[in-house]
Each structure stands twice: as structure tokens, then as C-alpha cells.
Design a protein with these regions (language model features):
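Pore- and gate-forming transmembrane helices of large, multi-pass membrane proteins
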Residues: 289, 341-376, 750-780
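Extracytoplasmic
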Residues: 155-276, 281, 575-682
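Juxtamembrane segments of multi-pass membrane proteins
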Residues: 435-557
Length: 818
């Protein structure tokens, strides 16, 4: 190899020119890359219909757009009055903002419009409108029921409505629409059950997946509340509470951003301080980071070319995984450091001949581990695997072929002879701890055997980045406002809006018997507010002509408990005649009513395909049992049978929580299989490269031991493993393979050699850099980052220690050489 060039000569080297050209191409690709957070990237390649429904609800469902608001405190003699005033002013401000499609706080803002709408369209909305109901016998029975209401608490309202609605359609519809449980009222607005909190429900216009829009909406709520506090007497001590999917998303994003910035800055300071202590040169430090930056650029570009977009999770995980690349430059600069008696070029040639083959084998080992992800059925894992492979290979190639030219001819690092000598003595003594390691592994295996049933988490909630106190506040506010859980859904596809509505009506007819028997507490249905055209026509056809209806009403008033004259119902006959002539109800007619919001949420269209959704409510259980049992669940078999009886192809009953957990379990199983396949590939690679089963086992043993001990530690701490732990273990193997290979390295003899002092120092520095980079994540407030830090930090350190303990004994003459 030629003498490493310096100054401008380095940039005329073919390898450097090719590297610069590659960076330019990567920059062009990255500049045109779109980054996405769409969860469909982490669906299987061929997702089930249920999984599609799950992602649609997470992205754009009604619940994803809800912000639950609480107002606590408020000074003065009557804090409840202060909170009510704040609630009214806050609601009024938000209702005028286009960012919100609905604001509910208990005020009867749309009640008058809703009642007028129901009154005007009662004969197309009421499921009771049938030919039988408007026969002479049916009218007689309906009129009798309405007359009975005159003696009840609703008598005044019934008396006023009787001339227009003797069949009681309005009363039945209003009762049906108001059937859901509402929060209690205090001073005219919603309040918590204990009366210590005013509550509101805001529905954003933007989808829940639009985090930026959700952040703007949340900021609007805060500013509106602050303005209301300033304008309301005795309100200075009032406190605003918010929760909901959008709030969680924004808070999590901000927390992750803050933690990543804080911990990254701290880890960067530690790594820079560590490397400067060894390198003594800022220039060498900057050069050492070039392989990492090059790997990141190449990884992003490769995924962009292969998939069209780069998922945010892939970028986050991949950037963390590629942290292994910083080790390569450490090996180069420390292991090839020249002395006053050795020319830099000779030292570099010796490094390439002696150490590069081992590093290259370590890179291939890491590639084998990550390559297993390329066979995943989940595009998200394929992205992660491709990103890591391209990044690591690029970083290794830059270290081998570019850095030698850029570093110059005169590179000296701090004299590490004393540290190397101490590490050599420690390494020689390390094998004495083998029996201690054996006992540790026996204990780890015993712990894993005892905790095998609960070792892996089977619920997606295990990955939740939401802190426990935020989850508790969410549960409290949901209980206060009765917000929908929307765990259970029946989804009916349709080629058109009318087809979806007709399907919803058929399924509703099958579900109603379950409500009548108590197997189902109730369900929502878009066709309740917007019946299909066919149903509307059938109901209008049930209305008799005016002359026929007049004669039937004369018969209906006979033998009633209260005597009424047929002439009293002239307005009723006129209303029926008007209904027969009016056009069919359309979606636009609901504008301005609360029912329009329900239809918009339950009847959706995407890519020309319509879907009607029927959220189901599980039967309630008594308060005592809720303290000891799980929340109520539905009889899934009965629901599916009812849906099947509707004879609608494509109709689905979906338990969103169960589907999310099932999807997560599939991820875990897929990852375990791929991890095992990757481990087998690594073993085969080492066996071929090392040409010895014994050396292969020696190289693998420290990695397996580190993974076992880390896993046992989680089991003993009662921490269930998740997909994040598994990815962390894969990184332990990737990083630890370099340590194990160096301790099993041969240098021109048939026997393994004791690692040289500079090699031991390079391994220690690389390990400390890895621990600084990953270990600090253990102090993150975000559970996902904390999990990754607790896995990789200790695992990397244990891999180095175990590699030293299990290293083969060196030949006597090689001790002297070392």
C-alpha cells in the first residue's frame, strides 16, 4: 500500500473520490426522500382486513380525534361557579375555531336544532314507521300510548306535541338519541362525578395521526384557557388538564425529542471526551465520526430507493443500531498508532494485515444478524434490516479505504502502554473466573426456566410510551365524560354510500336481539341518523294518503282513556301529507346538528370504498366487580354469529385491543424466528471463516452468555420482554462479536494469541463509547428508550468481560510478544 497522502493529495485518491461521489448521490436521494409515520409500514405485507381497520382507527378514527379537558381549582366562595364560567368561555372560544369540529361541555348549543331536525324528519328516521303502525289498529294503539304519557312527568311536552305527533315518533327518537350516559351537570355544564372538576370534550378537525395539527389544537386550547382565566374573576388558581390520543402523541413526541437531545448531547460529550483523551487531536476525532455519518447517509438513501419512503421508526432504530460503526475508527486509530520507531505507513500495513480480517469478519457477522430481517413479512422490519446492513458495510468500507488517506502520515495518540499492560495482566487473569461465569449462567438459566410462562409480554400496551400518571388521568377523565372506548367495532364495507348504509341496517337488525337479551349494552349506527334511501322510501310508503289517514284517525280516537276529537289531529294529517311529498333525507341535511358529527365518524370513504362502522358497547358490570375484575368484554362468538346471519360479504367484527395484541404477538414471534435464523447464519459464517468448530464455539459463547444474563436480569426484575429487548439483544451480538473475535485471533501461528496491548485498549475504548451511547438511554423518561438502554448498555459490557474470561490461553512465547 502507498504512503497515506495528506492535504489536497488525499482527495485525489480514487477511494476518496468515490466516497465523496457517493455522499453527493446520497444527499441528492435524501433531499427527495419523504419520511412517514404511517403505521401501515409496520403492517404485514398482506395484512388482514382486521389489521387494516385497526390502523385506520388509530390514524383517523373518532377516538383518535378526541381531546378530553378538565378544569380544576378556581378560587372564591363558589369554585364550582368559577369552573362553570371558565368552561363556558373556553367552549365558546373553541367553537369559533375551525381546528375543532365539535365542542361539548353540556350546554344545549345544538339541542334546539337537533329537536327541530328530528321533528321535521321523524317519519324517515323512526324505525317504528311501518304499514301496521299506520293502520287503524296501529294508530289506535299508538294514540293510546301517547295519551297515557299525559299523566306522566312528560305530560306537558306530550300535550303540546299530541296534535302533530299522536304516534309519539319524536318522543321515541329523542329518547333513542339520548340513550347514552352523559356526565352530571353542575351550574349548567358538565362536571365530574364528585363535582370537583368541570369537563369538556373537544373533537379536532384533523386526524389523530396528524401530530403537528394536534399540537396546534392543544396549544389553542391552552391559550384559550389562559384568556378565560384572565377574564374570569377568582380564576387565577384554576388548572387545565388535557388527555387523549392526540395529547399523548404530542407529549410523547416532545418528550422523546427532549430526551434524545439531552441524552445525545450528554453521550456525545462523554464520547468526545473519551476519544479526545485517547486521540489528543480534534482532527482525528472528526475523522473518526466520518464512517458513522457516511453509514447513516447510505442507509437512508438505500431505504428510500428500495421503499420510496423512510419510516420514522426505522430511522430512529437504525441510527441507534449503526452506533456500532464508531468502533471501526477506534480500532483503526488505536491499533495502528505508530511509535517513534515505526513508520506510519508500516504501522497501517500491519493493521490491515493483522486486524482488518478480524474486523471484516465482525462486520459480516453483524450483517448476517441483520440480514435475517430482510425475510420478514413486515415491511418495517425489512426497512430496519436494510438500513442497518447498508450503514454498517458503508462505515466499515470508509474506515478501511478512506480514513487511511484522510488521516495523514503523522497520527499519534496518547501513549497507552501502561493501560495496555494493565489490561494484559487482567486478561491473563480473567480465565480464573470461568467457574464463576458457569455458576452465573446456571443461575440465569434457572431464572429463565422459572419465569418462562411470563417471560414475553403479549400486549401492545407493553410498548406504550405514556407514563402511568398520564394513563391514570386519562382513565379518570374518560369516566367523567363517558367518552367512547370504541374497542369493539362491526365494519361493513360497501361499493357506495347507500350500499354501506343498507349493510349497516341489516347488521343492526341482527344485533338488536342481543341488546334486548342484555348480551350487548348497545351500539351506534350511522343509519340511525341517515337511513338508506331504500329504508326511507319504505317508511314513506307506509304513510297513507290524507283522506285515508283522516278516516283511520276517526276510528283511532274511539275507546281511548281520554276523550279527544278527531279534529285535534288536523296538524298531524298535514304533516304526514308534507312528509310524503318531501325529498329523501341527504347527508347535507344534517349539517349543523350533532348527528352530522356521528355520521361523519361512522360513515367514511377511502379510495372509492365506503365503510359503515357500528361501535359496540359491552354490558356494564357492578361497581364492586370492576375493582377486582377486568373491564367487561363481549361474547365475540355471539357477535360474529349475528354478523354472519346478515349475509354481508366482507362484514367484520373487530376487537381492536385483541387485534393490536395479536399483531404485536405476531411481531414478537416473527422476530424470534428471524433472530434464531440470524444466529444460525452467524454460527455457519464463523465456522467457515475460522475453520474450527472449537474456535466457533469460543467466539459464540460470550455472546450467548451475555444475552442469557441480561435476559435473566429482566426476568428477575419482573420485566416482561418486548420486541425492543429482542432488537437490543441483536445489537449485543453485533457489537460483542468484535470483542469475541479479537480474543480468539490468530497471528501467524496455529495457536490463538494474547491480544496486543493496543488491541486491548481499543476494545476498552470502543466498549466505553458503546456504553456511553446506549447506556445513557436507561435514564430516559420514555419507556421505549429506557428499555433499549437497559438492554444494550449492560449487554455490551458483559460481552467484553465474558470474551476475556472465555478467551483461550495463549502460547508462552506469545505472552512475551504481547
Amino acid at each position: 500500500m502507498r504512503e497515506p497522502a495528506n492535504n489536497t493529495r488525499a482527495y485525489r485518491q480514487p477511494a476518496v473520490l468515490l466516497w465523496l461521489l457517493g455522499l453527493l448521490l446520497c444527499a441528492i436521494v435524501i433531499g427527495r426522500t419523504s419520511f412517514t409515520a404511517d403505521l401501515s409500514a409496520f403492517l404485514p405485507r398482506s395484512p388482514s382486513a382486521e389489521q387494516r381497520v385497526l390502523v385506520d382507527q388509530l390514524r383517523e378514527g373518532l377516538v383518535s380525534r378526541l381531546i378530553l379537558i378538565g378544569i380544576e381549582g378556581g378560587g372564591g366562595d363558589d369554585a364550582a361557579t368559577t369552573r362553570a364560567a371558565l368552561s363556558r368561555q373556553l367552549a365558546a372560544t373553541l367553537r369559533a375555531d375551525a381546528q375543532f369540529s365539535a365542542i361539548n361541555n353540556g350546554e344545549p348549543v345544538s339541542e334546539a336544532r337537533d329537536r327541530q331536525f328530528v321533528f321535521e324528519h321523524r317519519y324517515v328516521l323512526s324505525p317504528a314507521v311501518t304499514p301496521q303502525r299506520f293502520s287503524a289498529e296501529g294508530l289506535h294503539q299508538a294514540l293510546g300510548d301517547s295519551l297515557d304519557l299525559l299523566a306522566s312527568s312528560a305530560g306537558l311536552v306530550a300535550k303540546n306535541m299530541l296534535p302533530h305527533d299522536p304516534t309519539g315518533e319524536v318522543a321515541a327518537l329523542v329518547s333513542q338519541l339520548d340513550s347514552t350516559a352523559l356526565p352530571s351537570l353542575s351550574n349548567g355544564v358538565w362536571a365530574s362525578r364528585d363535582g370537583k372538576r368541570a369537563v369538556l370534550v373537544a373533537q379536532t378537525s384533523a386526524a389523530g395521526s396528524d401530530t403537528d395539527a394536534q399540537a396546534r389544537a392543544i396549544d389553542t386550547v391552552r391559550r384559550a384557557f389562559d384568556a378565560a382565566v384572565r377574564a374570569t374573576p377568582n380564576a387565577a388558581s384554576a388548572k387545565l388538564l388535557m388527555t387523549g390520543p392526540g395529547v399523548f402523541s404530542v407529549d410523547t413526541r416532545d418528550t422523546i425529542k427532549h430526551d434524545v437531545e439531552r441524552l445525545s448531547a450528554l453521550s456525545l460529550v462523554l464520547i468526545v471526551a473519551l476519544l479526545l483523551t485517547v486521540y489528543r487531536s480534534p482532527r482525528t476525532l472528526v475523522l473518526g465520526l466520518l464512517p458513522v455519518l457516511s453509514g447513516v447517509a447510505a442507509g437512508v438513501a438505500a431505504v428510500s430507493i428500495g421503499f420510496g419512503t423512510v419510516h420514522g421508526l426505522t430511522l430512529g432504530f437504525g441510527t441507534t443500531l449503526i452506533g456500532e460503526a464508531v468502533d471501526y475508527s477506534i480500532y483503526l486509530f488505536v491499533q495502528s498508532a505508530g511509535t517513534h520507531t515505526v513508520r506510519p505507513a508500516d504501522s497501517l500495513r500491519a493493521w490491515i494485515a493483522t486486524y482488518w480480517p478480524t474486523i471484516r469478519l465482525g462486520v459480516l457477522t453483524s450483517v448476517c444478524g441483520f440480514a435475517s430481517m430482510l425475510f420478514s413479512g413486515f415491511p418495517g422490519l425489512v426497512q430496519l434490516g436494510l438500513y442497518s446492513i447498508v450503514g454498517l458495510v458503508t462505515a466499515a468500507m470508509v474506515t478501511r479505504y478512506v480514513l487511511p488517506h484522510l488521516r495523514g502520515a503523522h497520527v499519534e495518540i496518547r501513549d497507552v502502554a501502561k493501560l495496555g499492560a494493565w489490561l494484559a495482566r487482567a486478561t491473563q487473569a480473567a480465565p480464573r473466573l470461568r467457574w464463576t461465569l458457569v455458576l452465573t449462567l446456571v443461575g440465569a438459566c434457572a431464572a429463565l426456566a422459572l419465569h418462562r410462562d411470563g417471560l414475553w409480554s403479549r400486549e401492545l400496551a407493553a410498548l406504550s410510551p405514556v407514563p402511568a400518571h398520564s394513563q391514570a388521568l386519562d382513565a379518570s377523565l374518560r369516566a367523567d365524560v363517558g367518552a367512547p372506548d370504541v374497542r369493539y367495532l362491526v365494519v361493513i364495507p360497501g361499493a357506495s354510500e347507500q350500499a354501506a348504509l343498507q349493510g349497516a341496517e341489516k347488521v343492526a337488525a341482527q344485533l338488536q336481539p342481543l341488546v334486548d337479551t342484555g348480551a350487548l349494552a348497545g351500539f351506534e349506527n350511522p343509519a340511525r341518523y341517515l337511513p338508506s334511501d331504500a329504508t326511507q322510501r319504505a317508511r314513506l310508503a307506509s304513510l297513507p294518503p290524507a283522506d285515508v289517514l283522516t278516516e283511520r284517525m276517526r276510528a283511532a280516537v274511539e275507546d281511548q282513556p281520554i276523550r279527544v276529537k278527531p279534529e285535534l289531529f288536523t296538524p298531524f294529517i298535514a304533516d304526514v301529507a308534507a312528509a310524503r311529498a318531501q325529498p329523501l333525507l341527504r347527508r347535507a341535511d344534517l349539517q349543523g346538528t350533532s348527528m352530522a358529527l356521528a355520521v361523519d365518524a361512522l360513515l367514511t370513504e377511502r379510495d372509492g370504498q365506503w365503510s359503515a362502522m357500528l361501535p359496540l358497547r359491552a354490558p356494564s358490570i357492578d361497581k364492586a366487580s370492576t375493582q377486582t375484575a377486568n373491564p367487561p368484554s363481549l361474547n365475540a362468538a355471539a357477535i360474529r354469529t349475528a354478523v354472519e346471519h346478515a349475509n354481508l360479504p366482507g362484514a367484520l367484527f373487530v376487537d381492536l385491543k385483541a387485534e393490536a395484541d395479536r399483531l404485536y404477538v405476531n411481531y414478537v414471534r416473527e422476530d424470534i424466528r428471524l433472530a434464531l435464523a440470524g444466529f444460525v447464519a452467524i454460527a455457519l459464517l464463523l465456522w467457515v471463516a475460522l475453520r474450527s468448530a472449537q474456535r466457533t464455539l469460543r467466539a459464540l459463547a460470550p455472546l450467548v452468555a451475555a444475552v442469557l444474563v441480561v435476559t435473566a436480569g429482566f426476568a428477575l426484575a419482573s420485566v416482561q420482554l418486548t420486541i425492543l429487548h429482542l432488537v437490543g439483544m441483536l445489537l449485543i451480538v453485533a457489537v460483542g462479536s468484535n470483542y469475541a473475535l479479537f480474543f480468539n485471533q490468530r497471528t501467524g501461528t496455529s495457536q490463538p494469541s494474547q491480544p496486543a496491548a493496543q488491541t486491548l485498549v481499543s476494545l476498552l475504548v470502543a466498549n466505553l463509547a458503546t456504553v456511553a451511547g446506549f447506556g445513557l438511554l436507561a435514564f430516559s423518561r420514555v419507556p421505549m428508550l429506557e428499555t433499549f438502554g437497559l438492554t444494550v448498555g449492560p449487554g455490551a459490557m458483559l460481552a467484553l468481560v465474558f470474551a476475556a474470561i472465555l478467551a483461550p490461553k495463549a502460547a508462552p512465547d506469545q505472552h512475551t510478544a504481547a
